[in-house]
Amino acid sequence: MDDWFEKYAEALEKRLDSSEASLHLPGHLKNPILTLARIVAHGTERKNAPLATYVAGRYVVARDAQGVDEATAVTEALKIAEAITPTRES
């Protein structure tokens, strides 16, 4: 998965101007983002997981513009998802 993901991010990054931000995903952010996707996929309709991660990414960009570091913004997005996602009974 990591090789494919890195290739994908690199291919997208090549389409951006050199002045644009890097699309590299720091290792310490991968697990929280995957956890967000898992929580949403298992607590709601599965189709919400990729949409939630997209919206979370936009949230992180907006919070970064406000001076909040990425790790904090990802944690905020994850906590919000946890708070509003119903837990399914086993």
Q: At which residue positions do the language-model features occur?
A:
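An amphipathic alpha-helical micro-motif enriched in hydrophobic residues
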Residues: 48-62
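Thiamine diphosphate
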Residues: 1, 9, 25
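A short glycine/serine-rich beta->alpha loop
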Residues: 37-47, 90
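Acidic-glycine-rich active-site phosphate/pyrophosphate-binding loop
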Residues: 22-36
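N-terminal acidic leader/helix
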Residues: 13, 17-21
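C-terminal binding/interaction regions
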Residues: 2-6, 19, 72-90
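S-adenosylmethionine-dependent methyltransferases
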Residues: 3, 10, 35-39, 71
